[in-house]
Amino acid sequence: MEEKVLVTGGAGYIGSHTVLELLEAGYSPVVIDNFHNSIRGEDSMPESLRRVQELTGRSVEFEEMDILDQAALQHLFKKHNFKAVIHFAGLKAVGESVQKPLDYYRVNLTGTIQLLEIMRAMGVKSLVFSSSATVYGKPVPASGRGPPHRGCTKPYGKSKFFIEEMIQDLCRADTAWNAVLLRYFIPIGAHRSARIGEDPQGIPNNLMPYVSQVAIGRREALNVFGDDYATEDGTGVRDYIHVVDLAKGHIAALKKLKEQCGCRIYNLGTGTGYSVLQMVQAMEKASGKKIPYKVVARREGDVAACYANPSLAHEELGWTAALGLDRMCEDLWRWQKQNPSGLGAHG
């Protein structure tokens, strides 16, 4: 019998790639999503998951649901015998969180508390949580062996930090709980089929979707926020990870839960940092297009460099990021070329 796993927020970028990996690994995912970060396709199915079904030849059980809808969540848990939960659902734009802090705390914190309460009531005490490198605040590099930096500056990062603390407290209070908290660095790229990928609504918040939209002609030029950092070329250095590697990390995390692991925290990154200009050059190479850019003022709160120490994930999960920068950019460009309007243009 295939294990049923609840995936909250499973129609988004990382979620849809993880659902595909779950299916390929023999799990039976049940996905809930409220379409905040996803496109509605045919039959009220998220377009991303419709394409996952097409790629795998398997059906995905999906319910439109908001993480804040306690009654609907309770009903869902009564209907299914879940063995574990992978929790992606939440608001995720760092900049927007500064403008709308209460929204971020309500959705991310209250939504998670309600989910944990229902899990506890139903005896489902295995969780993989989608955390973020933003919990580190401003260390360079983020080591992952020590505690997070308490200098999270934005409500988004704080919400992830508070949830991590909450889950750790829960695991300490009740040893029947097992949780793996995955701190993501920056996912880029797309599935090699180019059928699913990152489809930001409106102006992309992240560097590489913006760069790829410049390459295909949807946007005029890239703004580079500062070229006077203490880095090799003066631009900010970050750790970029292929979304497929990141998705595979969740499969490794589910296996870890079976070991009665308590609460474990891992960085999912490559351990290598690339600057903004290095990323532009890599995308120019992959696309064969010149990517115009202009240097503008630094963004408040940006750090010079942030990259992962993923050694603990390698040691304890047997997980390593396998796909390099060239492959990330090639897959991203293929996705952008074949889906110039994103998932909105069904096909």
Curated annotation (Swiss-Prot):
Protein name as annotated: UDP-glucose 4-epimerase
A Pfam family that the UniProt record links to this protein: GDP_Man_Dehyd
Disulfide bonds: none
NCBIfam families from the UniProt entry: galE (TIGR01179), PRK10675.1 (NF007956)
Chain residues that bind substrate: 132-134, 184-186, 205-207, 223-225, 238, 299-302
Source organism of this protein record: Rattus norvegicus (Rat)
Family annotation (InterPro entries): NAD(P)-bd_dom, NAD(P)-bd_dom_sf, UDP_G4E
Catalytic activity: UDP-alpha-D-glucose = UDP-alpha-D-galactose; UDP-N-acetyl-alpha-D-glucosamine = UDP-N-acetyl-alpha-D-galactosamine
Keyword annotations: Carbohydrate metabolism, Galactose metabolism, Isomerase, NAD
Active-site feature positions: 156 (proton acceptor)
GO cellular component: cytosol
Self-association state and partner proteins as the record states: Homodimer.
Family: Belongs to the NAD(P)-dependent epimerase/dehydratase family.
Assigned EC number: 5.1.3.2, 5.1.3.7
Broadest EC class assigned to this enzyme: isomerase
Classification lineage: Eukaryota, Metazoa, Chordata, Craniata, Vertebrata
Gene, per the UniProt record: Gale
